[in-house]
């Protein structure tokens, strides 16, 4: 039996949407062809990601894929973090390593200081007691978010250089997320926050 679904008009109230008859196993064509329409003016958002000592190539590839999907400006790969070309990265990046600009930096501290001089807010994603809840955080764009080693996190020396620490709220008992999963949560929240600023600026014109 076919199901009828109507694409949301939340962000484009003037659009004319035709209901699409779908089988339960079919994908919604709207998501493929029109979902990016409200974001056409954004292109890349002023968000970059710094990975320091992320040991899993699969995690690195997943970061590339999330950065591509959310429209991030760049990935900075530091320490032992793997870098393209590598089959392990490609397996989860699915080609995103070719679409997202990236740089390798042996000295993350020097990179952080340079980005701060350029006006970036540097935010460490960590579980420190002084960290701000991700959903309460009011970032100052452009922003560079830092993620560290899957077990050890970010080194204290790097945490001390950051302008702010941000934590993802954890309601379960494990109090942890895979680092690449955490990356997806953070960059999409930054996309949401930046789009709100973009929409407000557009309305004010």
Task: State where each predicted segment sits.
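Post-transcriptional modification and biogenesis factors for structured RNAs
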Residues: 1-205
């Amino acid at each position: 039996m076919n199901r009828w679904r109507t694409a949301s008009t939340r962000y484009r109230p003037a659009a004319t949407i035709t209901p699409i008859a779908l089988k339960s196993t079919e994908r919604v064509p709207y998501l493929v062809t029109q979902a990016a329409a409200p974001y056409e003016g954004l292109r890349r958002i002023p968000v970059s990601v710094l990975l320091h000592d992320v040991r899993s190539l699969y995690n690195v590839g997943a970061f590339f894929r999330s950065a591509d999907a959310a429209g991030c400006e760049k990935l900075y790969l530091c320490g032992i973090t793997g870098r393209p070309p590598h089959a392990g990265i490609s397996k989860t990046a699915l080609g995103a390593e070719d679409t997202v600009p990236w740089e390798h930096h042996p000295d993350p501290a020097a990179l952080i200081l340079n980005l701060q001089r350029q006006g970036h807010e540097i935010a460490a994603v960590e579980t420190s007691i002084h960290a701000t809840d991700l959903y309460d955080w009011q970032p100052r764009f452009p922003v560079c978010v830092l993620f560290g080693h899957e077990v050890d996190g970010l080194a204290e020396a790097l945490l001390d250089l950051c302008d702010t620490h941000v934590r993802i709220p954890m309601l379960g008992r494990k109090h942890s997320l895979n680092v690449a999963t955490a990356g997806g949560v953070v960059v999409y929240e930054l996309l949401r926050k930046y789009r709100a600023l973009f929409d407000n600026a557009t309305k004010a014109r």
